Amino acid sequence: MAHHRGHRHILLYVSLALSLGLALAEDATDPSDDTGSFDDVEAVSEEADLDPYSMSQELNKRPNVDPYSYLPSVGKRAFDHYGFTGGLGKRKIDHFGFVGGLGKRQIDPLGFSGGIGKRYDSFAYSAGLGKRGMDSLAFSGGLGKRGMDSLAFSGGLGKRGMDSLAFSGGLGKRGMDSLAFSGGLGKRGMDSLAFSGGLGKRGMDSLAFSGGLGKRGMDSFTFAPGLGKRGMDSLAFAGGLGKRMDGFAFAPGLGKRMDSFAFAPGLGKRGMDSLAFAGGLGKRMDSFAFAPGLGKRMDSFAFAPGLGKRGLDRYGFVGGLGKRGMDHFAFTGGLGKRDSGEASGDLEEGKRGLDAYSFTGALGKRGLDRYGFVGGLGKRGMDDFAFSPGLGKKRMDSFMFGSRLGKRGMDRFSFSGHLGKRKMDQFSFGPGLGKRGFDHYGFTGGIGKRGFDHYGFTGGIGKRQLDPMLFSGRLGKRSSSEQEEEDVRQVEKRSTTEEQSSKSL
């Protein structure tokens, strides 16, 4: 019995298998219905070469055919301007239309899709997956809205309207400005070529830059490497925390400059300007450019006190190791060679006097010359455009720079990188410790005193008195006329000393 029961089970399994095979055979599709979409890719390439406008003409010939009928019936949009759908939806024949999720877009200029989709434009970018076509220079960083502007860019979520060449790096709004840039969160309006690196607002200025938090307005060519406010001055410099809202401003941090008389003592690149200075690592390809770090220069009047090579130019200088040949007035501050130069002198310890464009790389003295440079310890007096990257003293000259310890008096546009004093000059700046008095637009980056000046700024601890529009970056006090009397006495003493020095020279 057990043997017969086993045969019956086998027959039952066979009959079930045959029944299942017949059922599957009935449900099989006809091979003639195969589309062959995976056999030939030429159809895809032909579809990609189609003109979007010809596609729109075919849509007009078939008005009863909905090209979006396959999409879920979440919503439909047709023949509208500035229409938006946040999720799944349909869009057609609209301008400046946006879809935040999945969908398709066609026949619109400057259209943006933040997620997955297709676009038929040129030079367009979508932050997610998709394609762009038929618009120029349109960019969308994420989800957002765009309308009535050309060459507009939105980095994240936000709105943009009625501006050209406007850029917003994060979340925010932008309107009615041209060539305006906002790096983070904030608002921008009615300015041109304005840049804000962090959070803040900008308005009514041109070519203004703010590196940190704050506000900027009504100035040109301004740069702010830190926190603070600056306004309505020219040739102003902020060595520490602060902002600049004037012309020919200098930022000692990181950045780029494309103007003239610009100075960036940190890391960066400079190009297309004259009399530009980069204090750290970088390259310069202009005239009167100075790079005190590592770099190369291929122009005239260029100075690189670090490692590098110079050739076939005049007034070229390298402060460290290098070679110079076939030029005039070429100098190397450390180890190097000189060939065919007109200037001579001891490169280690020496003196230079009564000449122009003379340079000493180590210890030395300079007097009565213009454009004099000392690489190490030295003194300078009664000359213009003097630069001392080491320890030294400077007086009675304009456009002087002392990067270490030094003193400055009775000159305009003088700069001391570390410790120093400044009296009776305009636009003077001491990024380290120092004192300032009787000047306009004076700035001290560290500890110092200020009196009787406008728009004075102290980056650290200091005192300010009797001036309007004063800003102190940290702790500060302003009091009494004692500082005024002290400044007057110091100025008189400095004037007497300078007269004696002038007579001796």
Curated annotation (Swiss-Prot):
Listed Basic and acidic residues bias regions: 488-505
BP GO terms, sorted: neuropeptide signaling pathway
Signal peptide bounds: 1-25
UniProt-annotated location(s): Secreted
Any coiled-coil regions, as ranges: none
Disordered: region residues: 472-505
Residues where Glutamic acid 1-amide is found: 349
GO cellular component: extracellular region
Modified residues (Valine amide): 74
Keyword entries, A-Z: Amidation, Cleavage on pair of basic residues, Neuropeptide, Pyrrolidone carboxylic acid, Secreted, Signal
Summary of the function given for this chain in its UniProt record: Modulatory neuropeptide, acting presynaptically on nerve terminals to inhibit acetylcholine release.
UniProt name for this protein: Buccalin
